[in-house]
């Protein structure tokens, strides 16, 4: 009787038969198929045997003539010409819920450190989601303390702001993210580790993040050996998880390491689907996907997503395409300087080259005056540093330089901070004021 009812419902809905496709060609990262009927971003199953037991999940990334271009979420071992392809008819979603806190997931939201069935995940969020309407966004008006003196004092971040951390390799980006995750006043951390070395993931979770930070965090991991589609989706999965907590009224800190590797994954996808390479080999989709991702962060009527995105600067060239594009979209940038790291000045933040575009709107007048005075002292000393070091400057020649020499020790003391040091926002402002006593 049940079978009859199911057949009746199937006939009533017009689903008289199911369409399948077949693999026609496998080239590099992409799989070209003839059929089935599909839309962009639909999930498809590529079956590896006639019984249709084993399959590889893939996504529609483009169309070429009468062919569909798929990219797999796993390696393509076992996929060959003639394999049956079935369209699921829906795009990728991620299961979300409060019980995700304290856990790690992969690039498409599958829990990796326990059985997902043991967690009560009450909602499904689409991974590909549009940014909020500009007129529905709340204005950024509140400070979000991150617990690092140099940032809170001189590059103050607001709830809902998006800011980039720009640096070459090995300058301390991951360590700085760990400090933010442990010290921030945000309710929830969502951390995306994209294209990282496999050994660094556990090191970051146990050493940089620690039990204190992990307890209120969700970590999305897609290591460098994963397919380009997984690395690309990891950034969007992390943003979707952050959107879930924002919709619940939480203030979320979304940290992504790194935006550069997201763009590199998009480059692989774009080139494999037939896009032409343009600036430095990046296809046009890289420059359209980045703003789509970054614009999803921000304030809503109930909660906020504050985005911190690391950008790996290729060859320390701060004008290369990805760096330049990210800087133009974000609401500010924190520049890390390798030379400061060589002087054991950590975090190696170049505050003169860094800026928060919302600081003027959220900081008090007194705070802005103190930050301006410190930057003036640092700029004056930096300009005269070579003369001072070779002994060519004589005391009394310039009052501003004399004052900078007097205060530079206190300034550097304020800008440096140990990884285990923690300050409240009020304590940071007091320390900033003491620099000029």
Sequence positions of predicted segments:
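Active-site phosphate-binding and catalytic loops of NTP-dependent enzymes
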Residues: 11, 53-54, 92-96, 111-117, ...
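Flexible glycine-/small-residue-rich
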Residues: 25, 35, 48, 62, ...
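P-loop NTPase catalytic core
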Residues: 153-154, 160-437
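A generic structural signal for well-ordered coil/turn residues at beta-strand boundaries
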Residues: 19, 40, 100, 121-123, ...
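P-loop NTPase nucleotide-binding/switch module
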Residues: 83-85, 99, 112-161, 174-179, ...
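Glycine-rich, flexible loop/turn motifs
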Residues: 88-92, 108, 123, 131, ...
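N-terminal accessory targeting/assembly segments
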Residues: 1-103, 108-112
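Phosphate-interacting basic helix/loop segments used at nucleotide- and nucleic-acid interfaces
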Residues: 3-8, 88, 146-151, 238, ...
